[in-house]
């Protein structure tokens, strides 16, 4: 199994969705009752056809579109969740070779041509389409998704928010980073990358970090997110290739250690993150 889409992959997908904005919707295929649950076939189409997507938003790993209805009024929000390995594909006008891809970086363009793995699609009046390609069928499309339970976006969290939300708990540091109600968007690989770059133990109690250490953690977190977004995903991180048996730390050469923290498989430098 490849890495699950985390904040950087979802941000790349959100940027792809921007290619679909302000194009008139003429058809919606929402027949996949599992991917589009709890809606029935035709429910999503009924409110989107004739309208437009007007904005693409994201908080953490949650992504949604604002819409305009056929009569020009504000429409419902449309949630697009990538699941474990989903990908967004947006094609240009009919006859154009322009396509944009975002989401799971391990899905090849050849695979995305398989129509049976397109779980949801929107067709525009210019002949282009937006598709949710999801081989494993673990994504989700729904109207008015609930994002209120999510914490602040990990790429935008303020210094004071991180100090109180992450530092105010006796839980292991990695567990706090993974808690989407604390801050939204950090998954297993990104957490390991951030803690390795910050030289912090994943199992250290979060409330033992000093204010200076928490501020450093925020700087490193933002830097890792920015780098992963620019380079195509969390899998491009500096330590990710060393999350394996018999690997050594890319920085100091010490053996990489493996364990379970916060219920997730975790790798860290046995010397610098002890």
Predicted regions located by residue number:
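Structured catalytic/nucleic-acid-binding cores of DNA maintenance enzymes
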Residues: 1-274
């Amino acid at each position: 199994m490849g890495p699950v889409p985390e904040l950087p992959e979802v941000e790349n997908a959100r940027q792809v969705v921007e290619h679909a904005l302000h194009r008139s919707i003429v058809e919606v295929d929402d027949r996949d009752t599992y991917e589009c649950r709890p809606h029935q076939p035709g429910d999503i189409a009924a409110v989107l056809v004739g309208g437009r997507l007007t904005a693409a938003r994201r908080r953490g790993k949650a992504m949604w579109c604002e819409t305009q209805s056929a009569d020009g009024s504000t429409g419902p929000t449309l949630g697009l969740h990538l699941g474990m390995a989903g990908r967004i594909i947006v094609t240009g006008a009919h006859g154009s070779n322009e396509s944009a891809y975002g989401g799971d970086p391990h899905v090849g363009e050849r695979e995305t041509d398989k129509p049976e793995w397109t779980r949801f699609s929107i067709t525009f009046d210019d002949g282009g389409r937006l598709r949710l390609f999801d081989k494993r069928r673990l994504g989700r499309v729904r109207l008015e998704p609930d994002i209120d339970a999510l914490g602040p976006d990990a790429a935008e969290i303020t210094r004071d928010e991180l100090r109180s939300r992450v530092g105010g708990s006796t839980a292991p540091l990695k567990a706090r980073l993974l808690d989407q109600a604390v801050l939204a968007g950090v998954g297993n690989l990104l957490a390991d990358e951030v803690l390795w770059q910050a030289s912090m133990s994943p199992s250290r109690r979060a409330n033992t970090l000093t204010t200076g250490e928490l501020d450093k953690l925020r700087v490193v977190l933002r830097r890792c997110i920015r780098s992963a977004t620019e380079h195509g995903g969390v899998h491009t991180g500096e330590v990710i290739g060393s999350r394996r048996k018999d690997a050594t730390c890319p920085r100091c050469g010490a053996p990489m250690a493996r364990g379970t923290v916060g219920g997730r498989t975790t790798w860290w430098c046995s010397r610098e993150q002890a």
